[in-house]
UniProtKB/Swiss-Prot annotation:
Gene Ontology MF: a single term: GTP binding
Described function: Displays ATPase and GTPase activities.
A Pfam family it matches: RapZ-like_N
Species of the source: Frankia alni (strain DSM 45986 / CECT 9034 / ACN14a)
The protein's name in its UniProt record: Nucleotide-binding protein FRAAL4592
Record HAMAP family: RapZ_like
Keywords attached to this entry: ATP-binding, GTP-binding, Nucleotide-binding
Residues that hold GTP according to the record: D64, V65, R66, G67
Residues annotated to bind ATP: G13, L14, S15, G16, A17, G18, R19, S20
Amino acid sequence: MTTPTLDLAIITGLSGAGRSTAAKCLEDLGWFVVDNLPPALLSTMAELGHRSGGAVSRIGVVVDVRGRAFFSDLRAAIAALDARGMHPRMLFLEASDDALIRRFDHVRRPHPLQGDERVVDGIGRERALLAELRGEADLVLDTTDLNVHELRSKIDAAFGQPGANRLNATVVSFGYKYGLPLDADLVADCRFLPNPHWVEELRPYTGRDPQVRSYVLAQPGAQEFLDQYAALLRLVGEGYAREGKRYLTLAVGCTGGKHRSVAMAEQLGARLAADGVGVRVVHRDLGRE
């Protein structure tokens, strides 16, 4: 039996350069992230990952090596992992002195190495201490001019998997008489279409049934609505992707959540899937009557 491959990433760098943000980005990509792990425990963490049988295949570790002893421990831990055939990738985050000073001023906290001196003194001390480690990093990111979304994009490019950045949409049909879904990002109202409930031969069926679906889609404005709303969702989806938002809940409503909203939700879900969006269609109120 083949042992599952373990991907190990070490996040380190200057205080205030974005280590915590980078860790959150890895978590959003599905990594198991441990903050401020002592370097001496890296091998133990890697072993636990191997023993998980693939349940934990990507581990990110935020390492603080401001102490000289921790610096030596980190180099020894990486050497031990290399000897076992595991080659962790190291991400080093840095920023300009001006940017770091502004960030510490914004959070109103002292630099951990400034002591009784100024923030800039602590930054200089840490920069000198970590200079050698920076030279050994696999990837150095300067976050001086990066906002959170731009940093996320760079982390995605370096550590994401194919398809990890795609938008995932949950399309929820619902009945207005039961209330709007609380988690909806966007709401589409299909009550402008004639209600199949008032067509006696269609009343027992739902929007999943072909006779109701055909009736709804044949109504004036139905296809135009689908075309224009799908175009809107493409635009919104692209914007969400740029902003690092990967999950969208689209609510599609009619009076009772049985006919029109169900048929239209199925159609919108199919169009989103054709555009490469991960889609799950849920009919919240189907069967409530």
